[in-house]
Amino acid sequence: MEKLVIVGAQWGDEGKGKIVDLLSKDYETAVRYQGGNNAGHTVIVEGKKYILHLVPTSILHKHTKGIIAQGMVIDLEVLSKEIKDLEVLDIENRLFISDRAHIILPYHKILDRLFEKKSNIGTTLKGIGPTYMMKYARKGIRMVDLKDEDIFFNRLEENLEFTKELCEKVYNERFELNKDEVAEDIFRLFKPIEKNIKNTFKIIQTSKSVIFEGAQGVMLDIDIGTYPYVTSSNSSTLGLSNGTGLHPKYFTDAKFVGVSKAYTTRVGAGPFPTELKDEIGDALRDFGHEYGSTTGRPRRCGWLDLVALKYACDTNGFDEIILTKLDVLDIFDEIKVCIAYENFEDFPSSLKDMENARPIYKTLKGWKATTKAARDKSKLPKEALDYIMFIEDYLNTKVSMLSTGPAREDYLYL
């Protein structure tokens, strides 16, 4: 059985969607196992752009089954729209949703907004965090619960009362959600996909080849990321077992691949040691079109942080790294990479230490030649190859592939 795990090695937005699309064409089954519609994978196929938030990217291959596994939280409105947008690909009979996956409800989004006003973490306000919060408080509503109206209405009523009290007594805000209206909307969206609700654990276990698609990135992982400026799930390889229901031994023969940009970006608040708030940062953003596919927010940009990337490799066991957006660096005479932080030997776990981390840079010669759409290693400038070799040596991990542009065909193997 062939198993491939693709995970973002930075703060998300590394270009995983295209990589997954490229590598998944021979796989029988594709699995999303954590997160929700707080991340978007963008893929361009035959000139048409697809932005997928919940449905696995690999389902764009017409022979591939797509699984939304138990570790995900699902906004039924968003899922319904994605299925409709992909109607031409006839995905309805190839998409399976875990009966254990939790559902995002309107009160989760209200709570998200209220929490964000207090904490300013930089959440997408999609209700993701509060859905996970209620999951772990044992107050969540799962897909399977929609098949039993008594369970659903009891949970819904309890959660609406809890949210109403929180809104009115703690945040001094009116709460106007109506139980019957919420239920009507949920069942309207649920009925068309009810046939797709399955025990997805069994489907994965019996598949001959499986690709696992991570969302966000290692540095946003709830446990090993830059806490508290993280997402609400394990967006690293740590989330595989609990996100799918598969035991850890299942993954012992899997290949783990991390995807990283040739520089670093981050959306929202949180520590970012190599951030550039100057014309170089602006150039990276403009030339790299660095705006979030889900939020449209401009991304913060900076030089490649090898300290953070090495930490991601070590904590996730990456067998290979795939480097994206190398072509964005074509415009620079010199390129810097962070090889250490002042006063810190290891990647800090303390927020205060991370905010005070000062990068120590190594300056490498730029290539000032186009690598855009390069599809052959022999066509790459020597300085670009030197840059890749420096990264490999520092990480002690092979860079196996480059993405050199947005089109599906813009890539090369090393």
Curated annotation (Swiss-Prot):
HAMAP family: Adenylosucc_synth. It comes from the Bacteria. PROSITE patterns: ADENYLOSUCCIN_SYN_1, ADENYLOSUCCIN_SYN_2. The keyword Phosphoprotein does not apply. Mg(2+) binds at residues 13, 40. The active site is at 13 (proton acceptor), 41 (proton donor). Keywords: Cytoplasm, GTP-binding, Ligase, Magnesium, Metal-binding, Nucleotide-binding, Purine biosynthesis. Substrate binds at residues 293-299. IMP binds at residues 13-16, 38-41, 124, 138, 216, 231, 297. Plays an important role in the de novo pathway of purine nucleotide biosynthesis. Catalyzes the first committed step in the biosynthesis of AMP from IMP. Its EC number is 6.3.4.4. CDD domains: AdSS. This is Adenylosuccinate synthetase. The gene is purA.
